[in-house]
Amino acid sequence: MTTTPCNMNITIRITRSTITFTAPNTVIEGQTDFEQYNMKTGIAVAANLRQALAECHILKAQSAPGRLQEQAVPSQYHPVFDTATVFVDTPLLLIPAEEFDAETMPQLYHYANTKHQQDDVEGTPINQINVVAAYAVGKDLRFVLTEMFRNVKFMPLLAPILVEFCRRSYGGFQEKLFCYFHDKRVDMFAFRKGRVRFCSSFEVSLTPDAAYFILNVWQTLGMKPSDVLCLAGSITGQEALLK
């Protein structure tokens, strides 16, 4: 007997250091399963992903009781998880929705991010802040995913972060600079009247590096001592940073 997919979704989050899997438990209703794979250094992200998929206990489930049907042709795809929503951590290019052009998006992105010339470019609307987020998806990464899942939906890792920061930017008369720390990097955002005012990313291995970039952006935006600095994420040396 062969099986058809159960139209279930698995969420895959790919960062520089980890790959995580989140999915509804196929046996216990209402329970969510979570699994993390640590990236191996020295091999490509796509190779890490292939290994993570092979080792993932969530994906090793071969059936979902009571939800499988017979089909005439064997399927190459996973028998339980029909769709994968994949969050990727590649540089963002935020394009105002009113200026977005799907045909010119790849050219604009590759011009701004020269290290991703060979990658595909995806665009995801973020309606809450009226932009389209352009970001890179490696061809090898896409191939590995489409081998296993019938439907693959890509999303930028920072999309929900942007929406939450924009929501928190309202209220009060002070300007706010938001800093999100992760994977030895800090992403900085500023908003005004629900629109993105500033968006950039900086490599930060040491606390003094983070302090330098934050102060530089603060001064560039003309922010005052009475304005608000918001820090989030995995912050190394937080006490030293706040001195």
Describe each region flagged by the PLM:
Residues 1-7:
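Short, surface-exposed loop/strand segments
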Residues 8, 13-22, 29-30, 37, ...:
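Small-residue (GG/TT-enriched) beta-loop-alpha framework at ligand/catalytic clefts
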